[in-house]
Regions:
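Extreme N-terminal segment that seeds HTH/winged-HTH DNA-binding domains in transcriptional regulators
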Residues: 2-52, 106-135
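Short secondary-structure capping/turn micro-motifs that flank functional sites
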Residues: 58, 93-94, 135
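Terminal helix-turn-helix DNA-binding modules in bacterial transcription factors
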Residues: 98-105
Length: 135
């Protein structure tokens, strides 16, 4: 296991503490759970543009995870445009929060469309689906 300097976690000024819950029983990979939790915090406005979040090492310590898991999550978030890493300065939420929210909305809509397709595949028509969903 790696060394964790607990005193650093609570005394860093300006760094937003990430309250992330990990479900070890879930089939969703842990790094992906971290990604989803941070995206949710951005979508809900808990994390705002320009907020500095924990470093890879600090978040790994906070969550009791391997730093490589957090690195994979941060790399994914950076590819999605949710965060940006500035060398020697830290990791920050990007200014384009609307893009993140739109991406989350599109993801949910895609899931709903898939479920509607499943209902149609078992014989329900769109009218019946709307009625059951009370739309």
């Amino acid at each position: 296991m790696f060394f964790c300097r607990v005193y650093d976690l609570y005394f860093k000024i300006g760094v937003v503490f990430l309250n992330i819950n990990i479900d070890y029983q879930s089939r969703v990979p842990i790094y992906e759970q971290v990604v989803l939790e941070i995206e949710k915090m951005v979508a809900l406005g808990v994390l705002n543009p320009g907020d500095q979040i924990s470093s890879i090492r600090d978040l790994a310590c906070e969550l009791g995870l391997n730093p490589n898991t957090i690195k994979k999550a941060y790399d994914t978030l950076e590819q999605k445009g949710v965060i940006i890493s500035k060398s020697t300065k830290g990791t920050f939420i990007t200014d384009d929060v609307a893009k993140v929210k739109d991406g989350k909305i599109e993801s949910i809509i895609d899931e709903i469309k898939e479920k509607i397709q499943e209902l149609e595949n078992i014989g329900l028509d769109k009218k019946e689906i709307s009625k059951r969903l009370e739309l």
